[in-house]
């Protein structure tokens, strides 16, 4: 009979994913905590919280991160364009997860090289800023079939990372 494993019974394998998550103006403590947890789950090398000072003492961050904020390498309160320029210079492929007039679906996107990836996500209400979108050549969106054109930023990041990791064979 199948039984759910406890945390202590779960075998963990740490992998180097060569992937960085860049958050452009994400401010909600619940989303920040959720993104820490997500980054730990996917083995993300680093997460940048641009334009946001992360309040690690926040009970909401602690609760939603389930202590992963203590495990994930991160930098906060930094300018998004500075991060984009630094990562591009280091050879990362920047990808914007945003529905735009030039975006492709995650399903149709093809990875054509083995460069490390920097996935950019945006603010809960306004998305990725226009000045950042103008500097990133590849825009990707999640195909959605309901009446809403957006989803929660943490959920979108999870879908985006999973789709990219399937294409890069990280799983």
What is each residue range found by the language model?
Residues 94, 120, 156:
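A residue-level signal for conserved active-site and pocket-lining positions in enzyme catalytic cores
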Residues 3-100:
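RNA substrate-binding interface of SAM-dependent RNA methyltransferases
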Residues 35-37, 61-64, 109-112, 133-136, ...:
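Short, glycine/charged-enriched secondary-structure capping and boundary segments
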Residues 30, 78, 123, 127, ...:
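Residues at secondary-structure transition points
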Residues 32-33, 58-59, 105-107, 129-132, ...:
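Short glycine-/acidic-enriched loop or helix-start segments at secondary-structure transitions
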Residues 99-144:
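Active-site/ligand-binding-proximal alpha/beta "capping" segment
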Residues 52-54, 124, 144-148:
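Short, acidic/turn-prone active-site loops that include or flank metal/cofactor-
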Residues 132-171:
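Structured adenosyl-cofactor binding patch, chiefly the S-adenosyl-L-methionine
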């Amino acid at each position: 009979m199948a039984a759910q494993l406890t945390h202590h019974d779960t075998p963990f394998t740490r992998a180097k994913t060569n992937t960085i998550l860049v958050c452009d103006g994400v401010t909600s403590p619940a989303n920040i905590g959720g993104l820490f947890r997500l980054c730990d789950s996917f083995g993300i090398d680093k997460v940048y919280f641009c334009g946001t000072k992360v309040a690690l003492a926040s009970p909401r961050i602690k609760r939603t991160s389930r202590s992963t904020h203590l495990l994930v390498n991160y930098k906060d309160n930094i300018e998004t364009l500075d991060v984009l320029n630094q990562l591009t210079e280091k050879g990362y492929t920047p990808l914007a997860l945003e529905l735009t007039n030039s975006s492709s679906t995650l399903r149709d996107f093809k990875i054509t090289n083995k460069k490390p990836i920097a996935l950019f996500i945006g603010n809960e209400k306004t998305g990725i800023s226009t000045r950042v979108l103008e500097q990133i050549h590849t825009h990707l969106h999640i195909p959605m079939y309901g009446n809403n054109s957006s989803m929660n930023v943490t959920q979108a990041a999870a879908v985006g990372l999973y789709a990219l990791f399937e294409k890069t064979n990280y799983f």
